[in-house]
């Protein structure tokens, strides 16, 4: 796709493109996390537990989503000093969250040497109308989506990884399942379209035509797609992998549980062996109490996923 900087092609675990571009490098860095688990941590000790459990990366933040829900207030970028301490404590990549549209928070995170930035709806929005222009940054961005249109709009802005929005901090997987099924369902419809129908479909999605066509040709998103929002058990993680995700984010589900280290190891094993029921039985046994979840049928529960489009 000339001029788009978008890469394709998934094959044998490698992205191939004749012409290298800064965006292709970022997508390649994100693809290195495929098949892994990214864990939310609030201090160096938790980061070390995550690394020892086999996490492929950690997300450094001052409050996990469950605490953001419980405490309320404005949720902002974490203290850079705390992020630096976590970076010094582990050898795996470290991510951090910036508010949607807050490009200065992203500039600060890039300046302290963070490996990936999550432009996150879990934090309070800084701009209701504009996301960050992620092409202006050297490091890869992660963005959430509820459907194919949102995913492709974020990729056009420069997102190198897409995740389901789900409902972070609830321990309830239903919204993450809804979002990944929505994306995959639209891709199945797209694959069966004639090429001359794609223009109308792209217009319906409010997504760039070239990315819609590329998705049709690939049969999947042109960047890695992780599950996030409500993953609390090994079974949840395996479910999202069987639904076609490339990896899993786990936030409150680990360190709000009764035995974080054991649950962290179990979720990593579940992602690795997601299609092996016998292994899933083994890793699901004796984990202690899971995090207390939130019933999303309660109208009083704030929907983080609806904060942006």
Curated annotation (Swiss-Prot):
Gene3D superfamilies documented for this protein: Aldolase class I (3.20.20.70)
Protein family according to the UniProt entry: Belongs to the PdxS/SNZ family.
Pathway: Cofactor biosynthesis; pyridoxal 5'-phosphate biosynthesis
Additional comment: Vitamin B6 is an essential quencher of singlet oxygen in plants, that can protect cellular membranes from lipid peroxidation.
Example of a GO MF term: protein homodimerization activity
GO cellular component: cytosol; endomembrane system; plasma membrane
Annotated D-glyceraldehyde 3-phosphate binding sites: 181
Residues annotated as signal peptide: none
Residue sites binding D-ribose 5-phosphate per the record: 40, 169, 230, 251-252
Tissues expressing this chain: Expressed in cotyledons, rapidly dividing root stele tissues, stems, leaves, flowers, mature pollen, and siliques.
Entry coiled-coil feature ranges: none
Keywords attached to this entry: Acetylation, Cell membrane, Cytoplasm, Lyase, Membrane, Pyridoxal phosphate, Schiff base
Residue numbers annotated as active site: 97 (schiff-base intermediate with d-ribose 5-phosphate)
Pfam families (UniProt xref): SOR_SNZ (PF01680)
Top-rank taxon: Eukaryota
Subcellular location: Cytoplasm; Cell membrane; Membrane
Induction: Not induced by cold, salt, drought or UV stress, or by abscisic acid or jasmonic acid.
Species: Arabidopsis thaliana
This protein's name: Pyridoxal 5'-phosphate synthase subunit PDX1.3
Function: Catalyzes the formation of pyridoxal 5'-phosphate from ribose 5-phosphate (RBP), glyceraldehyde 3-phosphate (G3P) and ammonia. The ammonia is provided by PDX2. Can also use ribulose 5-phosphate and dihydroxyacetone phosphate as substrates, resulting from enzyme-catalyzed isomerization of RBP and G3P, respectively. Also plays an indirect role in resistance to singlet oxygen-generating photosensitizers.
């Amino acid at each position: 796709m000339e001029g788009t900087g978008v890469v394709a092609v998934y094959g044998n675990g490698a992205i191939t493109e004749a012409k290298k571009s800064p965006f292709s490098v970022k997508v390649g860095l994100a693809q290195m996390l495929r098949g892994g688990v990214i864990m939310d941590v609030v201090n160096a000790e938790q980061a070390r537990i995550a690394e020892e459990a086999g996490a492929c990366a950690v997300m450094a933040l001052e409050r996990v989503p469950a605490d953001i829900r419980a405490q309320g207030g404005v949720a902002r970028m974490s203290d850079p000093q705390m992020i630096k301490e976590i970076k010094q404590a582990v050898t795996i990549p470290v991510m951090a969250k910036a508010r949607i549209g807050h490009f200065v928070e992203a500039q600060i995170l890039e300046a302290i040497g963070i490996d990936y930035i999550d432009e996150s709806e879990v934090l309070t929005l800084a701009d209701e109308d504009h996301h960050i222009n992620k092409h202006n940054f050297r490091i890869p961005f992660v963005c959430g989506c509820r459907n194919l249109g949102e995913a492709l709009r974020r990729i056009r802005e420069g997102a190198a990884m897409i995740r389901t929005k789900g409902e972070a901090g609830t321990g309830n997987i239903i919204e993450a399942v809804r979002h990944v099924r929505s994306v995959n369902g639209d891709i199945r419809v797209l694959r069966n379209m004639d090429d001359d129908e794609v223009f109308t479909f792209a217009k319906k999605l409010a997504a760039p035509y070239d990315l819609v066509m590329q998705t049709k040709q690939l049969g999947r998103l042109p960047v890695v797609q992780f599950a996030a929002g409500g993953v609390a058990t090994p079974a949840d993680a395996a479910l999202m992998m069987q639904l076609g995700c490339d990896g899993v984010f786990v936030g409150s589900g680990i360190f709000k549980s009764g035995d974080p280290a054991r649950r962290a190891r179990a979720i990593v094993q579940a992602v690795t062996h997601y299609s092996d029921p016998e292994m899933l039985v083994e890793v699901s046994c004796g984990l202690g109490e899971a995090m207390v979840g939130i019933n999303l049928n309660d109208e009083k529960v704030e929907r983080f996923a609806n904060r942006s489009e």
